[in-house]
């Protein structure tokens, strides 16, 4: 966002991110983005200030692939994604604080951006080398497209690259312009 010309503060939101029973992945990411934005705006927003919150998940065959708990789970996720297409979904919520700094938003806007990502067919050796690098261990779906090793996994992408990184910047900037 700084590269887009915005002065930002990063403030983590302390919310419960547990999915509801039978909650669809896209519904989940939008709900979490809204909850994060509301929590941060209520606590920290100044008059007319914007709060941008996001949550990103990786989904495959309708199930959410979170961060791997250990190397075995990372290997299993990478094998599952090997040669296949999965989705990266980011829910975004932008809240414009009221001009009197009331905790309630004067306006808000939210959306979900989805990008299809297709992996190359991965050999066991490639998976082992990538897992051994440690790179997949703190990433949803056990990979980071922006990482050194992660770049080597992706065969094709349909949608916004920056959505896969974690924030669809161009769409966020356009949404901000609507609120200003």
Question: What do the PLM-derived regions correspond to, one by one?
Answer:
Residues 1-11, 179:
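N-terminal G-site helix/loop of the GST-like fold
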């Amino acid at each position: 966002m700084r590269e887009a010309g915005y002065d930002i503060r990063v403030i983590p939101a302390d919310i419960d991110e547990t999915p509801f029973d039978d909650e669809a992945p896209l519904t989940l990411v939008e709900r979490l983005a809204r909850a994060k934005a509301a929590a941060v705006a209520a606590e920290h927003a100044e008059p007319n200030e914007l709060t941008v919150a996001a949550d990103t998940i990786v989904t495959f065959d309708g199930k959410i692939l979170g961060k791997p708990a250990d190397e075995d789970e990372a290997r299993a996720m990478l094998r599952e994604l090997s040669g296949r297409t999965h989705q990266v979904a980011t829910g975004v919520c932008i809240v414009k604080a009221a001009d009197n700094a009331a905790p309630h938003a004067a306006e808000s806007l939210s959306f979900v951006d989805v990008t299809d990502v297709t992996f190359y067919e991965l050999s066991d050796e490639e998976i082992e080398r990538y897992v051994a690098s440690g790179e997949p261990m703190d990433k949803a779906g056990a990979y980071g497209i922006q990482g050194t090793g992660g770049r080597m996994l992706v065969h094709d992408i349909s949608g916004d690259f920056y959505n896969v990184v974690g924030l669809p910047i161009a769409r966020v900037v356009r949404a901000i312009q609507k609120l200003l």
